[in-house]
Regions:
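Terminal amphipathic alpha-helical/low-complexity segments used for targeting or macromolecular assembly
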Residues: 1, 64, 70-143
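Single conserved hydrophobic/aromatic residue that forms the stacking wall/gate
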Residues: 1-10
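Conserved SAM/SAH cofactor-binding pocket of Class I
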Residues: 5, 25-26, 38-39, 43
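Helix-turn-helix DNA-binding module
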Residues: 24-32, 112
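A contiguous pocket-lining binding segment that forms or flanks enzyme active sites
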Residues: 32-66
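Residues that scaffold the ATP/ADP-binding catalytic core of kinase and kinase-like folds
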Residues: 24, 60, 76
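Right-handed parallel beta-helix
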Residues: 11-18, 28-30, 47-48
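Glycine-rich beta-solenoid repeat tracts in large extracellular/virion proteins
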Residues: 4, 20-21
Length: 143
């Protein structure tokens, strides 16, 4: 299925019971899709992201982001998942700060990306978030 270009599932994802993926979905490393999560066709789910139970994902989800609801809304950073993967507390705090820049300050995507890029030297994992944002077409709750 995946070798024919119908979608991409990378490694080490957790797909809980009754998670449904439509065609051409891409799921990044260490993403967790909780029970009864629905993912619309052509959506991309970023690395280390998390969906709450019963979430309906109709747009792309950036790396590290926790989404919940129907339709899905970005809620916070997947801090618990990051701790389990060995991320340091300081790095998780900086990713939270990056999330707030992206989702809570009312900035356009271009301005938010500029601010995030200034944080990469101190917190290299923010580059993963930036890269995922640049690859996504339609994503959650950002101007």
């Amino acid at each position: 299925l995946w070798s024919r270009g119908l979608g991409d599932v990378y490694k080490r994802q957790i797909l809980v019971n009754n998670t449904a993926l439509a065609g051409h979905v891409e799921i990044g490393d260490w993403a967790i899709l909780s029970g009864y999560t629905l993912v619309h066709q052509f959506c991309k789910i970023g690395a280390h992201s998390f969906s709450g139970m019963g979430t309906s994902i109709g747009k792309d989800v950036p790396a590290f982001v926790t989404v919940a609801g129907s339709p899905a809304e970005a809620k916070t950073i997947n801090a618990e998942g990051l701790r389990r993967r060995g991320f340091e507390s300081a790095e998780i705090s900086e990713l939270r700060r990056a999330f707030k820049i992206l989702y809570r300050q009312g900035l356009t995507l271009d301005v938010a990306l500029e601010r995030l890029e200034s944080m990469v030297a101190e917190t290299p994992s923010i580059q993963i978030l930036i890269d995922s944002l640049k690859q996504l077409k339609l994503f959650l709750n950002v101007k």
